Curated annotation (Swiss-Prot):
Gene name of this polypeptide: FGF1
Source lineage: Eukaryota, Metazoa, Chordata, Craniata, Vertebrata
Annotated compartments: Secreted; Cytoplasm; Cytoplasm, Cell cortex; Cytoplasm, Cytosol
UniProt PTM: In the nucleus, phosphorylated by PKC/PRKCD.
Matching InterPro entries: Fibroblast_GF_fam, IL1/FGF
Effect ascribed to mutating residue 114 to A: Decrease in LRRC59-binding
Region (Heparin-binding): 127-143
Keyword Cell division recorded: no
Name under which the protein is recorded: Fibroblast growth factor 1
Quaternary organization: Monomer. Homodimer. Interacts with FGFR1, FGFR2, FGFR3 and FGFR4. Affinity between fibroblast growth factors (FGFs) and their receptors is increased by heparan sulfate glycosaminoglycans that function as coreceptors. Found in a complex with FGFBP1, FGF1 and FGF2. Interacts with FGFBP1. Part of a Cu(2+)-dependent multiprotein aggregate containing FGF1, S100A13 and SYT1. Interacts with SYT1. Interacts with S100A13. Interacts with LRRC59. Interacts with CSNKA, CSNKB and FIBP. While binding with LRRC59, CSNKA and FIBP seem mutually exclusive, CSNKB and FIBP may cooperatively interact with FGF1.
Species this protein is from: Homo sapiens
Role noted for this protein: Plays an important role in the regulation of cell survival, cell division, angiogenesis, cell differentiation and cell migration. Functions as a potent mitogen in vitro. Acts as a ligand for FGFR1 and integrins. Binds to FGFR1 in the presence of heparin leading to FGFR1 dimerization and activation via sequential autophosphorylation on tyrosine residues which act as docking sites for interacting proteins, leading to the activation of several signaling cascades. Binds to integrin ITGAV:ITGB3.
GO molecular function: fibroblast growth factor receptor binding; growth factor activity; heparin binding; integrin binding; S100 protein binding
Amino acid sequence: MAEGEITTFTALTEKFNLPPGNYKKPKLLYCSNGGHFLRILPDGTVDGTRDRSDQHIQLQLSAESVGEVYIKSTETGQYLAMDTDGLLYGSQTPNEECLFLERLEENHYNTYISKKHAEKNWFVGLKKNGSCKRGPRTHYGQKAILFLPLPVSSD
């Protein structure tokens, strides 16, 4: 190839006909603030725990589109959601409150912003004591909003 030439590739048009589903393994979302794992309980409560053996911390992240994810508890089947007051809760069915914008930060942690409230910059966050931080109380630069996706098994 000569200097200055541009190579273009044709778009992939073939379909792969894969069955629906998510092929990613469940993850644990470890919060930098206080060392808690994000947890969705059967009653819809969302909080953090340091107990790595808790079954409610296993989360399935599935992409809706580029950078947009649903976060679902593998144990309860509930989706992480943020209501109009910025409170986190578990929803039985996926809806617009369950979509989050996932972003990999420079420090290799992930942040999750509620897509519905993206213009307000409401992040998923945990306080040092493990309780949820309301969306309006979160902002960029806080440790409370930094999550590290970890494998479920420690090996």
